Structures are given as structure tokens and as C-alpha cells.
């Protein structure tokens, strides 16, 4: 035996520790914590080498996952119809056509139908800058502090909304610019109803504006449609549906929206 294989020789002669498997399992479980700690604490050249190594590992993992997914979609190779080869007995009960491609195409079709179902009347809207959205509020004894902002657009706040203490409130939503109801038009029925707003689902400008409940053109809101008497296929009354704002609420003074059917 070569001289450099003394460890393997010792293992063959005396075996391993009784708790070897348990220690190995625990070490592998701690590996994620060690990697996270190294990523946060390493500095300089060692940090660059570590980041390069992690990047290559992640790229290899993504390639492996992608290849695995493609193999699942494509499935095993099927024999050609015109080659004339006889199938073995244990393969006679299998279907010759590959159903994975059919499943994949049906999933894509469902995605297209879903996208068409939730297509909005206004797919593109004008961007709004922060200077237009926020107004700087000067505070302090000598009015030199400028960390507060006041929203100049209409907003929606919930029923149980309470303002934060004055010295901790960074963004102010004026009570005069708060909206609770919207003029919602049903595109198929052709009627306009004054419905209460339940919440802001998506503001196309920024996720922060969605969290603040800012109502701008193109915003998706949820409205209470129980007054319309809409029911599902199971006979249940529809409570809330999405609608898209089609006007500029800060210019018109009201919220006009189209129901997404």
C-alpha cells in the first residue's frame, strides 16, 4: 500500500468511530450556518475568493436544475414509428406517444387564458416622480428640519386607521385627500355604481405607494360588489372584485374605475 494512504489503511484495520455517521450528519447540517457566517465576516481577498466560489456553485446548481426540468418535460426518447423495431414484452403496455409535451402545452395555454382573463384596460401609465408625489414639510423650532413628507395624491386608508405620533410620523396622508368610495363601471352591464373601496391591490408606480394606499391612474383596487348581486358558479355571493382606476383622482376629486371581469 502506498505511504500516503495510511488513513484508509487504519480505517480498514480498526474501523470508524461508533458515532461517525452522527458526527458527519451534524457537520453537514452546520455547513449552511458556516457558509452564512463566512459570507458576512470575510474581508478582502478571502471574501473575493469565497464569493467567486459561491457564484460558480450557484451557476452549476441552476444548470443542473434546468437540465433536470427539461428532462422531465421532454421525457424519455420514444421509438420511431417507421423503424419497424418490435417492442419488448415489458414495454407493450406503455404509450408510445409522449404525454409530457401535451401537458406542457396545456399549462402554457392555461397561463395565456389566465393572463387574458386578468388583462387590464390601461396596460401602461405615465410615471410619477417623487417630487410630484411628495411635498417636503419643514419642521422644528427654526423650520430647518426637512425629514417629513406629505403625499399630494389621493389615498385610501382602512377603517381602523390611526395616525402615528406627530414626532414619529414621517409620511403624512392628509384627511382631505382620503377616498373611501369609487365610481365603478361594469364593462359588460354598462352600469356605474358608487362602491366602497376595500383595499389597494397594486400601484404600478412603486410597491411603497401600494403600501401607503396611493390612488393614481392605473392602480388596481379591490371594491365591495355585494350590491351588484354577483354570484359564483356555486351560488355564493361575490364579496370583493378588482377594478382599475381610469382617471386622475387628484385632478377630478373622485375615483373612477372599471371592473375587471
Curated annotation (Swiss-Prot):
Any single GO BP term: maturation of LSU-rRNA from tricistronic rRNA transcript (SSU-rRNA, 5.8S rRNA, LSU-rRNA)
Keywords tagged on the record: Nucleus, Ribonucleoprotein, Ribosome biogenesis, rRNA processing
Record-linked CDD domains: NSA2 (cd11381)
Motif Nuclear localization signal 1 per UniProt: ranges: 15-22
InterPro entries listed in its UniProt record: NSA2_fam, Ribosomal_Se8/biogenesis_NSA2
Its biological purpose: Involved in the biogenesis of the 60S ribosomal subunit. May play a part in the quality control of pre-60S particles.
Family to which this protein belongs: Belongs to the eukaryotic ribosomal protein eS8 family. Ribosome biogenesis protein NSA2 subfamily.
The name this protein goes by in its record: Ribosome biogenesis protein NSA2
Amino acid at each position: 500500500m502506498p505511504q500516503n494512504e495510511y488513513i484508509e489503511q487504519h480505517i480498514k484495520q480498526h474501523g470508524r468511530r461508533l458515532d461517525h455517521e452522527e458526527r458527519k450528519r451534524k457537520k453537514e447540517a452546520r455547513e449552511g450556518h458556516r457558509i452564512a457566517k463566512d459570507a458576512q465576516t470575510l474581508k478582502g481577498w478571502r471574501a473575493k475568493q469565497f464569493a467567486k466560489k459561491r457564484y460558480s456553485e450557484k451557476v452549476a446548481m441552476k444548470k443542473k436544475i434546468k437540465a433536470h426540468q427539461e428532462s422531465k418535460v421532454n421525457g424519455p426518447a420514444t421509438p420511431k414509428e417507421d423503424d419497424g423495431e418490435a417492442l419488448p414484452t415489458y414495454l407493450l403496455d406503455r404509450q408510445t406517444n409522449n404525454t409530457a409535451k401535451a401537458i406542457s402545452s396545456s399549462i402554457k395555454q392555461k397561463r395565456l387564458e389566465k393572463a387574458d382573463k386578468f388583462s387590464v384596460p390601461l396596460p401602461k401609465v405615465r410615471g410619477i416622480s417623487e417630487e410630484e408625489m411628495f411635498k417636503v414639510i419643514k419642521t422644528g423650532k427654526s423650520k430647518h428640519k426637512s425629514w417629513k413628507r406629505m403625499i399630494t395624491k389621493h389615498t385610501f386608508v382602512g377603517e381602523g386607521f390611526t395616525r402615528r405620533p406627530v414626532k414619529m410620523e414621517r409620511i403624512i396622508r392628509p384627511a382631505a385627500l382620503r377616498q373611501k368610495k369609487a365610481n365603478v363601471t361594469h364593462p359588460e352591464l354598462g352600469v356605474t355604481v358608487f362602491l366602497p373601496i376595500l383595499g389597494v391591490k397594486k400601484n404600478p408606480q412603486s410597491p411603497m405607494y401600494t403600501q401607503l394606499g396611493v390612488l393614481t391612474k392605473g392602480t388596481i383596487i379591490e371594491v365591495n360588489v355585494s350590491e351588484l348581486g354577483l354570484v359564483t358558479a356555486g351560488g355564493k355571493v361575490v364579496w370583493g372584485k378588482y377594478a382599475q382606476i381610469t382617471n386622475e383622482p387628484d385632478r377630478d376629486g373622485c375615483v373612477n374605475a372599471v371592473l375587471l371581469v
